[in-house]
A protein has these predicted regions:
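Active-site acidic-Proline motif in GNAT/NAT acetyltransferases
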Residues: 104-106, 110, 138-139
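Acetyl-CoA-dependent GNAT
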Residues: 4, 8-12, 16-106, 117-119, ...
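Short coil/turn segments at alpha/beta junctions that flank glycine-rich nucleotide-binding fingerprints
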Residues: 110, 127-130
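Conserved phosphate-binding and hydrolysis motifs of nucleotide-dependent enzymes
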Residues: 73, 77, 111-113, 151
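Conserved acetyl-CoA-binding loop-helix of GNAT-fold acetyltransferases
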Residues: 109-122, 145-149
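C-terminal "cap" of GNAT-fold acetyltransferases
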Residues: 92-96, 130-175
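Short, conserved catalytic or adaptor-binding loops enriched in Gly and charged residues
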Residues: 1
Length: 175
């Protein structure tokens, strides 16, 4: 039995969700992968992507799902999925994308990332008859391997802006 709760994100979660997103991004990409983002770029990205003002419309978007996992009142993971926004020539209206799946360092190894991925895939499949899409950083081999195990294949790439810094992302698709 798990010692965490997965539920939809709510307004009351915005401040904690913002802090969790920032912390997890830094732990994963700066500390974990050693990406040397300039401080100004990182802060611009955080404001655009993880501020309460940026997150609020995402948790209320009726075309999306935004779950959090919490343990003892603390957010330990998040999952966001909705209509595909990835820049790929074969993408069609109505197809779905896993937009973000973050698991905090303290919750890794619990199977939570896989559980959230399965929930997201079920939700996406229920909301489209088309392909499912994921954008993943080109250096995150562990995530790529996980997504490949669920039938996703690399079909392209694009530049993902973190402020002025551009990360190289792979586009994965499951038809």
């Amino acid at each position: 039995m798990s010692d965490y709760l997965i539920r939809p994100a709510e307004d009351r979660d915005l401040e904690a969700l913002s802090a969790f997103s920032r912390r997890t991004f830094v732990e994963t990409f700066v500390d974990g992968f050693g990406i040397p983002y300039p401080a100004d770029d990182l802060e611009a990205f955080f404001q655009k992507s993880f501020s309460s003002e940026a997150l609020c419309p995402r948790i209320h978007d009726s075309e999306c799902v935004f779950w959090i996992a919490e343990r003892e009142g603390q957010i330990i993971a998040l999952c966001h999925a909705g209509p595909n926004d990835l820049p790929h020539e074969d993408a069609k209206a109505g197809e779905m994308e896993l937009r973000r799946l973050y698991v905090g360092k303290e919750a890794q190894g619990l199977g939570l990332g896989t559980e959230l991925l399965k929930r997201a895939l079920d939700w996406m499949e229920a909301h489209t008859t088309g392909a499912l899409w994921i954008g993943v950083w080109s250096g995150n081999l562990k995530a790529q391997k996980l997504y490949q195990a669920y039938g996703f294949q690399k079909v392209g790439g694009y530049g993902y802006p973190v402020g002025e810094w551009i990360d190289q992302e792979f586009i994965l698709r499951r038809a």
